[in-house]
Amino acid sequence: MTRAGEVLPGFAGGTINLASAGLGARALFATDEFFGPLERMLKDEPAAFHPGLYDDHGKWMDGWETRRRRGAGHDYAVIALAAKGRIAGFDVDTSHFTGNYPSACSIEACHSAEDPDEATEWVQLLPVTGLGPNAHHFFAAHSDAVYSHIRLRIHPDGGIARLRVYGTPALDLKAMANETIDLASCLLGGRIVAFSNGHYGHERLIAPGRGANMGDGWETRRRREPGYDWIIVKLAARGHVERILVDTAHFKGNYPDACSLQAADLGGMTAECDMLVASSAMFWNELLPHRKLSADSVHEYGSDMLRHADPVTHVRLNIYPDGGVSRLRIYGRVADPRSR
C-alpha cells in the first residue's frame, strides 16, 4: 500500500496504463454503479475530492462505487484495455474512499477478439487481496501472456477511485510487415525514454488522436538560458521512416520557433539502458533538418525532406528554444529483421 504522490514501483518502468480512458480503454460492464459510474475509474487524472458535492444518489465520489450489499456475493466490472498487451502490474487506488472502500479485490484477465461473454475463459492474475482506505495499492502480475480485457472483482462492495493496469502493448510484427504505421505510437509499443524538461507534461506526445487542449501534449518550462529542449522516443519496432508529423495543436503563444529530428539504430536496447540512450543522442544522425514551426498547426514532412533512409529504433525531437508540441507521429514500415 502506497500513499498518493509516492514513487511508482519498479514493475511500472517502461510501461503505459493499458486501462487509460485517454488511450482508448472502455468500461464494458459493472454489476452495480449506483454511486459512481465505472467510466470514472478509468480517468487519467488523479482522483479528486469535493467535500460539499452531492447528487441524487448521495455523496459524489470520483471513481466507481457500488451500493451497499444486503446479501451474499460481490461486485465486479469488466474493462476492455486500450491495447492488447503484457501486464506488469496494477494500481488499485482507493483515494478519498475512507469508509466506503472494498475490503479486498481480485483481478482476472482474458485474451479475446470480441468483448467477453459467459463462455470466455479468464485467468487469475491477482488472488483475493486486502485493501485499505485512501491509498494506492500496487500489485505485480507474474505472467508473460497477452491479454485484452480485465475483470476487477471487489469484495463485497464499495468504491475504487482509479484502476491502473501497467503493461506493454503487444505488436504483431508479421501482420504489419507491409503496412505504414505510426512507429512512435504508445498503443503499438512506442515509449518516451528521456527528455530535457517536461514541466507541463510529456506523456501525451505519442498518444492517439489530436490533443484536446494545451495540457494534452509535451510542454517545457520557459528557457532562461542558452540551448534548446529535446525528447527521445523509442519506436515500437525498428523501422524505415517515411513521413513525420509535428502537431502544435492549441499551442499558440508558446509553440516552439523551430524543430529538428535525429535518429539512431540502437538494436534491442531495453528499458534498463534508457540512461545510456540520452547521453549518446547528441551524436545521432540528422533525420529532419531545422524547420520552422507555426502556432496551432499540423506540420508534415515527407520522405523528400528526410536525410536518413536506414532503419532506426529511436528518434530525438529537438525544439528551439522551448515550448509545446501536442503530438509527434513517425510514420514508416517495420524493417526486415535481416536488414542492416
From Swiss-Prot:
Species annotation: Rhizobium meliloti (strain 1021) (Ensifer meliloti)
Biological process annotations from GO: allantoin catabolic process; purine nucleobase metabolic process
Keyword Transcription regulation: no
Name of protein: Probable allantoicase
EC nos: 3.5.3.4
UniProt entry keywords in alphabetical sequence: Hydrolase, Plasmid, Purine metabolism
PANTHER family reported in the protein's UniProt record: ALLANTOICASE, INACTIVE ALLANTOICASE-RELATED
Classification via HAMAP family: Allantoicase
Reaction(s) the record says it catalyses: allantoate + H2O = (S)-ureidoglycolate + urea
Pathway involvement of the protein, from the record: Nitrogen metabolism; (S)-allantoin degradation; (S)-ureidoglycolate from allantoate (aminidohydrolase route): step 1/1
